[in-house]
């Protein structure tokens, strides 16, 4: 409220001054008045902050200081009005900082825009080297898939190779049994010839020997057949597992 009252008082004073000087108003005077108004508004804003920050007990002191500042500002304004020769020179510095501030802000904005443009460029440059990564991943996945397919394709062939390798030793065992039987057959014939030439006692012994040989010959094919059957079952089991 106090600040508002002060502003109204200053406005009233300015209005009175304008009424008095309606005949000889100059642009320098208008600029000076605008500068004084701006200064008064800034001072009022500062005093408000001080009043809010200070305690209630310190409020009167702050008000007194604000009043003194306002009075000093009014005194300065009157002195400037009295010296008409010095008013244009003083009004120019009052109005000068505003365009400079504007130019400063305008000068900062293009640099900020350039920075903003530089950031997307950097992002695109970073994204460009990172782009080949998906293709490399696809190539790696394709290689792994081809390797797995090759392993699956080779597995039946390896099993097929293992099966003939197992069959070969089994086939080798069968001729061995046949050769053993062929070797025992001449021995049996020789024993029969000896039995015919020898007396009856020897014939009985030879007959027993022949029976033993025949029993052995009969058991060998059975054993070989059993072995062949067992090996055949093993092959079938291996094929089923494959």
Curated annotation (Swiss-Prot):
Topological relation to the membrane, as annotated: Peripheral membrane protein
Impact upon substituting residue 4 to G: Lack of palmitoylation
GO biological process assignments: axon choice point recognition; axon regeneration; regulation of growth; tissue regeneration
Alphabetically ordered keywords of this record: Calmodulin-binding, Cell membrane, Cell projection, Cytoplasm, Developmental protein, Differentiation, Growth regulation, Lipoprotein, Membrane, Neurogenesis, Palmitate, Phosphoprotein, Synapse
GO terms for MF: calmodulin binding; lipid binding; lysophosphatidic acid binding; phosphatidylinositol phosphate binding; phosphatidylserine binding
S-palmitoyl cysteine: lipidated positions: 3-4
Positions with biased composition (Basic and acidic residues): 9-32, 66-84, 98-118, 159-171, 209-242
Outcome of substituting residue 3 to G: Lack of palmitoylation
Subcellular location: Cell membrane; Cell projection, Growth cone membrane; Synapse; Cell projection, Filopodium membrane
Changes after translation: Phosphorylated. Phosphorylation of this protein by a protein kinase C is specifically correlated with certain forms of synaptic plasticity. Palmitoylated by ZDHHC3. Palmitoylation is regulated by ARF6 and is essential for plasma membrane association and axonal and dendritic filopodia induction. Deacylated by LYPLA2.
SMART domains, sorted: IQ (SM00015)
Region entry Disordered, spans: 1-242
A GO cellular-component term linked to this record: filopodium membrane
Domain (IQ) ranges: 31-60
Record annotation: effect of changing residue 4 to L: Decreased palmitoylation level
Residues with the Phosphoserine modification: 41, 86, 155, 157-158, 206-207
Positions with biased composition (Low complexity): 85-97, 119-134, 172-204
Function: This protein is associated with nerve growth. It is a major component of the motile 'growth cones' that form the tips of elongating axons. Plays a role in axonal and dendritic filopodia induction.
UniProt family annotation: Belongs to the neuromodulin family.
Subunit structure, interactors included: Identified in a complex containing FGFR4, NCAM1, CDH2, PLCG1, FRS2, SRC, SHC1, GAP43 and CTTN. Interacts (via IQ domain) with calmodulin. Binds calmodulin with a greater affinity in the absence of Ca(2+) than in its presence.
Designated name of the protein: Neuromodulin
């Amino acid at each position: 409220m106090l600040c508002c009252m002060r502003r109204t008082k200053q406005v009233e004073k300015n209005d009175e001054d304008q009424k008095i000087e309606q005949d000889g108003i100059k642009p320098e005077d208008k600029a000076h008045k605008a500068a004084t108004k701006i200064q008064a508004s800034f001072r009022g804003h500062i005093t408000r902050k001080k009043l809010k920050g200070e305690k209630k007990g310190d409020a009167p002191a702050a008000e007194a200081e604000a009043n003194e500042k306002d009075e000093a500002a009014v005194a300065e304004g009157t002195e400037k009005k009295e010296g008409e020769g010095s008013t244009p020179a003083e009004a120019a510095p009052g109005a000068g900082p505003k365009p400079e501030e504007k130019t400063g802000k305008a000068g900062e904005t293009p640099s900020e825009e350039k920075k903003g443009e530089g950031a997307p460029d950097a992002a695109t440059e970073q994204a460009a080297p990172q782009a080949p990564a998906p293709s490399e991943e696809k190539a790696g996945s394709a290689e792994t898939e081809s390797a797995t397919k090759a392993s699956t394709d080779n597995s039946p062939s390896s099993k097929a190779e293992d099966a003939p390798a197992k069959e070969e030793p089994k086939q080798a065992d069968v001729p061995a049994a046949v050769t053993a039987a062929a070797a025992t057959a001449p021995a049996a014939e020789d024993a029969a010839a000896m039995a015919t030439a020898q007396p009856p006692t020897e014939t009985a012994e030879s007959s027993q020997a022949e029976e033993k040989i025949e029993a052995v010959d009969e058991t060998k094919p059975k054993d070989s057949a059993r072995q062949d059957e067992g090996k055949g079952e093993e092959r079938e089991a291996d094929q089923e597992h494959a």
